[in-house]
A protein has these predicted regions:
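Long amphipathic alpha-helical scaffold segments
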Residues: 1-14
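Catalytic cores of peptidoglycan-degrading enzymes
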Residues: 11-150, 154, 161-162
Length: 162
């Protein structure tokens, strides 16, 4: 059960380094204070993985997001933006760790990175909530597995196995 739960989530990149947080910040193009609707992760030609099981609801390209993929995970949608390549298609069923694209610097971008934006019931939310959820599941599972290895095995009669 714990291994299945651990495998039910994934970080979007093999190495995680946050360059820019969700919320108001100085716009790198204008220098003015502007709302940043996601987080930016450091990346260099990295595979972008789905964080949970879901369905690809949109793939496309625009001036702002560049090449992007949007996945639906229940009430959440997660968009991965500024990709150099899209490696999935609309309607595809996706599992955690499935590669959906390669990081890049397409669209309104100052350099290569992965921009992740999340919506809950259509409203923008901080993607760190999803990353914190993934971290908590992984920590819970690792702790439970470690505890199960430390517990002495009991025989049906209640004694320890030898």
């Amino acid at each position: 059960v714990w291994i299945e739960r651990y495998l039910s989530v994934s970080y979007p990149l093999h190495r995680m380094k946050i360059n820019s947080l969700y919320g108001y910040r100085k716009d790198p193009f204008t220098g003015k204070k502007k709302f940043h609707n996601g987080i930016d992760l450091h990346a260099r030609g990295d595979e972008v993985m789905a964080m949970m099981a879901g369905v690809v609801v949109k793939v496309g390209q625009d001036k702002s997001s560049g090449k992007y993929v949007t996945l639906r995970h229940g009430d959440y949608t997660v968009s991965y933006c500024h990709l150099s390549r899209i490696l999935t298609r609309k309607g595809a069923a996706i599992g955690p760790r499935d590669v959906v694209g390669i990081t890049g610097s397409t669209g309104r971008s100052t350099g290569e990175h992965l921009h992740i934006s999340c919506k809950l019931d259509g409203k923008s939310v901080d993607p760190l909530m999803v990353l914190d959820y993934i971290k908590s599941i992984r920590e819970e599972c690792v702790a439970a597995l470690a505890e199960s290895r430390e517990a002495p095995a009991l025989s049906p009669a209640g004694g320890k196995h030898r």
